[in-house]
Every structure is written in C-alpha cells, then in structure tokens.
Amino acid sequence: MLIKVFGAAVQGIDATLITIEVNSSRGCMFYLVGLPDSAVKESHQRIISALQVNGYRMPTSNIVINMAPADIRKEGSAYDLPLAIGMLGASEVIRPDKLNRYLLMGELSLDGSLQPIKGALPIAIKARELGFEGIIIPKQNTREAAVVNNLKVYGAGNLKEVIEFFNDKQELELVHVDTRKEFYTQQNSFDLDFSDVKGQENVKRALEVAAAGGHNILLVGAPGSGKSMLAKRLPSILPPLSLGESLETTKIHSVAGKLGQGSGLISKRPFRDPHHTISTTAMTGGGSFPQPGEISLAHNGVLFLDELPEFNRNVLEVLRQPLEDRKITISRVKCNVEFPTSFTLVASMNPCPCGYYNHPTKACVCSPGQVQKYLNRISGPLLDRIDLQIEVIPVPFEKMSDSRPGESSADIREL
C-alpha cells in the first residue's frame, strides 16, 4: 500500500515541502532513500522503540520510503514523526483519509514523546501557503507556529496521541494565539532604561542620532566610563518593530533554535553582544547546513561588539560586505543560503592598550607607537562604515551621586 505524508525542510529562513512516500509490500526489508543524512537514517531505531513502548508493533512487511524531492538534503531528527506515521499508514494501522490534510514534524524520544524542533515558524508559513488544513508539531513549538493566521496548529506530546488523532479516537490540542494583541502588549517593555544613566549627555545625543538614522556608532573611552551600559540601552530608543519585521526576526531565531519553549513573536528589537573570541563562522553563520550567525540574529536590532580591537581581524573584516548589502550569502557545495543582516552596529573600545589615554585623572603608560599599533587593529574600510565615532569621558563623582533620574527611554523615543 502506498501512502504519502508531508513534512518540510528548512533552507535559510524559508521552508520547502518534503513529500514522504511510503510503500508497504511483502518482505522484511527497510529502505530509506531521497538524500537523508545520518540523523534521518537513525530514525528507524527511534521509531521501533517508540512504537514498542506505546504498545504498537513495528510493521513486519517490506517498507520503502522515498523523501522527495531527492535533490534536497534532509537533515536532523525532526522527520521522525512523519516517517513513523507514514509507516503505520502504509501498514494500515492508521486510517489514511486525513494524512494529506496535515503537515507533520517532530523528533521522537525512545519512549515516544515528542521533542521540540527548529524552524517551526517557517514550516507553518509554508503549510499555509500550500493550503494545508493544519500542522502537527511538538507542544513546545505550538505558540511559535500559531502566530500564522488561517492555519490550525495542533500540539502533540507523544506519538500515541498523533496515532489516535488520525484514527479519530482522540483530539489534539488546538493552539490559538492573538498575534496582534501579543505583539502590541509586549512591544515597549524593556528591562534597561536610559533613566539609569547619569551624565553622558553628548553620548546620549549621539545614540539618539544613531537610533533615528540607523547609523553605526563607535564609542571610545576608558574602562568604567559607561560604554557598555549606554550601548545596551540603545534598543529601548529604537523605533518599534513593525509586524512584518517582527515576523522576519522571529523566523531567523526559530531556524537557529534560539526561541525559548512557549515563545511566540519577538516584539522587541534583538540585542546581540558576542564575546571577542567568537569565530568567523559563528559571526556570519555557516556550517555544513548553514545556520544563522550573530549578524543575522541581530537583524532588525543591534549588534554590539565590546572591546573591538580584541576581535580577530578576520572576524571584523567579514563584516564589511554585510554592513553594505544588509544580507549575506553562504555558499556550500550542496546549497547557497541567504540570510538578512540589517542591523545597527555599536562598537566600543579603549583608546589605548592600558585604557587611560586622554583620561582626566589617570596617566596613560603607553608609548605613541603602542597606541598607534593598537588603533591599527581596526582597518580603514571597516571604520569607513561606522558613521559616528564619539569619545566617552568618565562621569565625575558629583554627577554620579546626583539622585535625580535622567531622561527616560520613553521620552527619548517621543522626540
């Protein structure tokens, strides 16, 4: 008996439909074709265990599974659920009449419970585009996928629930999310506020200009002058995300597996601050099957590079093209993937190796040659892409001890 079940492969931040064809006939062999990776091939053992634990027998017939289109590499364990359902459907354990109405994805544990997957949001968007009635995914991913309108999103806790759903013995949990209500309720709630900052009026003004015009900015100052504190508060004065920007940002974090369990739309601009030991691949994205890097996770938000000269020079130089093009294309033998990279770059650095060049009270111990060598770690082409460069002077004690609150982020946004 030939059965078709539908899943999806995520490439970049978009999904592609995968048709899983399962044919059951006389014999006792198992074949899985269609360019699966090792994790997909290992699904056979997970499915056997999951079925046994839940009181079902593995079909003893000859089973051939084809994952089409065959030119797309299928990776990861998220195909466990559609493969298991397809095998049971071909063996007539499951009624096949509803299989073509739903798209299924989920990783199986040995006890049959479903584990969360990456890319649930782009998968849900693709399911709606193709006219599916709904999708069945792990419960942990349902809020993320339920932001897609006009699509039924069902959450399942284990394999048995899905089997009984297709046999009309049990209803799965149908998840609804009021996308607009959730988006606008959380939009302007920030943990950090500019009212915490004492003094630094000129730096605040520069950050306001950067926020209003989308300009990159470099903060140069001694240790303890407040560079990081100011940079971390920049998202609180940026224009609020639009619903379209929020959806795109959420897709990127969904593909990277960075959304927390039960998370829905990202309603605030992301802030990413990687350590200076980061590799080039982690910054730009990549891998055998390309995943978003820090510059893509900062899309529509802020990328903060603290201690800029301490970053590997190659890591800094690869930022030049994404800063210009607002996108990055990662090329591999098997595929080319494009990720968006429209972010505001905020960088900070000390003025010299010791950190106290031009300090009002402390003496610098660096020679002119050491200072120049330190500054030369940042190339001219990269500095040319940073529109605003401002010196951050340490705040005197008198201003630090002032009990009056500073201007709030909400007031700055209204200017």
Language-model features, listed with the residues they occupy:
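Peripheral, non-AAA+ core regions of ATP-driven protein-machinery
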Residues: 1-218, 222-225, 266, 331
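A short beta-strand-to-loop transition that corresponds to the Sensor-1 phosphate-sensing loop
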Residues: 139, 306-308, 333-334, 347-352, ...
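Conserved AAA+/SF3 P-loop NTPase catalytic/coupling segment centered on the Walker-B
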Residues: 275, 291-324, 356-359, 379-385, ...
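P-loop NTPase nucleotide-binding/switch module
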Residues: 170-209, 213, 240-295
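AAA+/SF3 P-loop NTPase mechanochemical coupling elements
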Residues: 271-274, 290-300, 330-350, 362, ...
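Walker A/P-loop
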Residues: 218-261, 325
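The Walker A (P-loop) glycine that initiates the GxxxxGKT/S ATP-binding motif of P-loop NTPases
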Residues: 221, 285, 307
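Phosphate-sensing "switch" segment of ASCE/P-loop ATPases
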Residues: 338-342, 352-415
